[in-house]
Amino acid sequence: MIKSNYTTALAAGLVSVVSIGAALPSSAQHGPRDYQRTALTAMKEGKWQEALDAVDRCIRVYEPRIKTLGLDDGFGWFYYQKGVCLAQLKQYKEAVEAFKACYTKFPSAKNQLVKMALFREGENYCRLGDFAKGAELLEKFLKEYRSDPVARNVNAGEVQGLLAQCYFKMDPPAFEKGLENLTSCVTSRYKGRRITDAVITNGFRAMVDAAIKTGKCQETVKFVEAHPSVMNISPTRVALYAPRLV
């Protein structure tokens, strides 16, 4: 099991997509739909392994017969939920592969979760510590999400906060790109967008660490002067990290 030092605050997005069902024909009612119901019930109860088992069985049994059964790209739902379950079980490498399969094998609009799969793939690359790949996919998501009826509900400001973490945590840190995204994230909050404390706090913590590594402490001080409210975010007080800049 891989322990991740990457913090996401978009888990709430799971709630909005769990209720989206795969587009399955009536002829598949007693096949994939049964697995779907089992998986959804287990997920809502937090039984991630049980849900994963149901989704995996459906993929093994029905994916080889997608065309003959009249199934379409809506079957990507099962790969997406497989990725969700694996991520909840902290099996991030396997989650990446599941989300990648959802995005690449079922790319049409009939797969309602195709763009969300792109986001989740990037998110889980970050959890693996591959911040460059994670940032690449999150940037791609921001270019594509507005045209998608599901993904466009994601808060772009929070994605930029996560992108900031990626850039700051790269080796070496891409400090300017991190600063650009964290600034956009904080600005979105000033404009009234709901940006969670966790996103800004963890972005700022990553910024402090990157500033120390790159000698960019003065730039960080200027950021705080321009956005003083970030020093008083609860529950984690970012001010605790200010002495590290001195």
Where do the PLM segments sit?
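Residue register of alpha-helical TPR repeats
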Residues: 33, 70-73, 77, 116, ...
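TPR/TPR-like alpha-solenoid signature
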Residues: 36, 80, 119, 161, ...
